[in-house]
């Protein structure tokens, strides 16, 4: 059985009619709170702002055509009424060369240069724990589901759709990875059901990183790779 087939067989469709599509700039208001919810602690440390300000920044950055927060990197599950139910980002390591440039511009534009300096320094610390994807990798990030839809299988169905449509490779041609907080046992269990396995840690954790941001990198279909 292929990896895609295994995921499809293991994950039922959500109870209500759901469709899946690439995100658009018009989804910014709906997706920004979900993107924030995918990493409340991480964004709080990185941006050093209130939840409201973090979400406002993400909403603006989501509307951009460029960078890691752009709508062009995201896929969404939507209900019959068009409401966004779940979101995920797909970062291709072969196309992230200028991500840092775009995030500097986005931060300076929203928060101002003085605030941005501290944010960039904290971002460097965070990246020691959550590294950008290598050129050989595709990083899945910003995985979140509307709280009213959690437990319905909608995110799993969104992930499955990304495999079936080719938005994510399911044939092992690229290494698909994601990061999950060590303390987020529920999310890790979900990713394991989807076929992700934890990778051994190969880097020393920064002393400047808060303990609650300790993370595990996982790889899709890792048990089939050398």
Short names for language-model regions:
Residues 1-26, 216, 220-226:
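Conserved N-terminal entry element of GNAT/NAT acetyltransferase domains
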Residues 19-33, 44-45, 92-93:
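A short beta-loop-alpha structural element at the N-terminal edge
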Residues 39-62, 97, 109-112:
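Conserved GNAT-fold acetyl-CoA-binding loop/helix
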Residues 51-74, 79, 129:
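Active-site rim helix/loop that mediates acceptor-substrate recognition in acyltransferases
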Residues 76, 83-92, 139, 144:
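Conserved beta-strand in the GNAT
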Residues 94-138:
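Conserved acyl-donor/pantetheine-binding loop and adjacent beta-alpha core of acyl/acetyltransferases
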Residues 137, 172-177, 181-188, 192-194, ...:
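C-terminal "cap" of GNAT-fold acetyltransferases
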Residues 145, 151-165, 189-193:
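Conserved acetyl-CoA-binding loop-helix of GNAT-fold acetyltransferases
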